[in-house]
Amino acid sequence: MRVLLVEDEPETAELLAKGLNEASYSVDVALNGMDGRRFIESGEYELIILDVMLPGLNGWQLQQQIRKLGETPVLFLTTKDGIEDRLRGLELHEDDYLLKPFAVSELVARVRKLLRRDRGR
């Protein structure tokens, strides 16, 4: 299964990609929103994991572009816990939301859940 991870903190991106690789996912990593958009436009992904706060295009802007291209499930990663962010994500049809900090095992569990649900569509 091919996953795109868009995370601007290199150490975090490396840790998350390693955990996903160990769980048998093939992971491409983009370190900013513009690179994330290029990956999305040039490849097929079963799931996209987006940090909300990104340089270039932020996670919300990137999510709007993802939805124009199809229904690929999206998992947002953020430190923001405000109701406004949750509502915005719902308006943009996010599929799941994970608050930082979190354990890599929790991320893997959420990814599995989203991919199982998406196969049921």
Model-derived segments and their meaning:
Residues M1-G120:
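N-terminal/domain-start alpha-helical segments
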